[in-house]
Amino acid sequence: MKFYTEDYWQGDVLNPYLYNTVCNHFNDEETVMGGGRKTDWKLHTKGLKDVDILIQWIDACIPEAAIQVSGGGSSKDYGAATFDRGGFKINQCWGIHYNKGQYVTKHNHFPFAMSFNYCVSAPEGSSPFILDEEEIEPIPGRIVFFHSHRNHYTLPNKSDGRCMIVGNIVYNPLTVSYTHLRAHET
């Protein structure tokens, strides 16, 4: 599977707070490749209550996202069975805000394991997220998880106020369950 999505059941309540948080924490020294404004890379470590709530939910989604984007959902599937579902951790997280004409150039997040984008705001005319040339419409409250090595971008926005919280996830290979590895070798 190229990507995995989940919808946050409290997105409509939390998103206005997240939008304000992103807009109030712009990093004036950096802009998005293609325009737009962004926060620094460690938004998830600032002790911001609304971001902490979102991150707690994202953390809970990561194990299932890892199974799905790895292509294996069965314990009999060797690839899905050999990684520790608790071995993933958000390493970077930042907010991005785009207005009309702003976009993101094609890029990827290698060498991270997975990346995500959570849609905070997508007014009419907001550009889709394009992952390996597949368009994914931004839907407020929806998160998209994908392998970090996949190329992605957005086209120029046709409206003001598109806002995302995005991030990169690392995997600690020291947490691989060798019990699972041995069980599948027999």
For the regions a protein language model found, what residue spans apply to each?
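Catalytic core of non-heme Fe(II) oxygenases with the double-stranded beta-helix
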Residues: 79-156, 161-164, 170-175
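Conserved small/polar residues in nucleotide/adenosyl-binding loops
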Residues: 179-186
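Intrinsic structural disorder/low-complexity segments
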Residues: 13, 28, 47, 110-112, ...
